[in-house]
């Protein structure tokens, strides 16, 4: 089963997704695919919070770019934290949008149980630069693709989740 947790920054989506997959996995230790790359001290601090929270509850894999290739190797439930940062990394490495969406589509066809975390950035103001607008547009397309393929979708805000699908 594929499940999407989508919400704004600091909405609680990561914590809710982690609790959800741990509950669903029951006896299996789920994989935690961390897609973030460290570019500054502030991002390192955010990553540290996530690492401390998950402790040894997950088998952690850090891979910022090769999502499909990495997920093919997982033999159990997996949490992808987060699709938004993976999209950011793809744009940083100048991967064409069509290739990015094709890879995400392939990920969604994998048969493993998967929980995807994604930032809802389309509710914000229109960005003032081309790259930021490109990211927001790509993020929206990715969210629609995940929404279509996931059996469950939760919108997160204020530390709460609302089932959308």
List the predicted regions and their residue ranges.
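Conserved P-loop
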Residues: 2-72
């Amino acid at each position: 089963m594929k499940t999407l947790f989508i919400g704004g920054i600091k909405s609680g989506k990561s914590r809710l997704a982690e609790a959800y997959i741990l509950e669903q996995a029951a006896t299996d230790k789920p994989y935690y695919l961390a897609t973030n790359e460290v570019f500054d001290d502030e991002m390192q601090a955010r990553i540290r919070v996530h690492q401390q929270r998950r402790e040894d509850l997950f088998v952690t894999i850090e891979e910022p770019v090769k999502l499909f290739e990495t997920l093919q190797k997982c033999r159990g439930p997996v949490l992808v934290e987060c699709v938004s940062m993976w999209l950011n990394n793809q744009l940083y490495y100048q991967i064409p949008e069509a290739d990015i969406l094709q890879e995400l589509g392939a990920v969604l066809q994998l048969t493993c149980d998967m929980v995807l975390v994604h930032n809802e950035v389309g509710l914000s103001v229109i960005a003032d630069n081309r790259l930021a607008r490109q990211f927001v547009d790509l993020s929206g397309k990715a969210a629609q693709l995940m929404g279509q393929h996931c059996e469950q979708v939760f919108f997160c805000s204020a530390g709460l989740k609302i089932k959308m699908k």
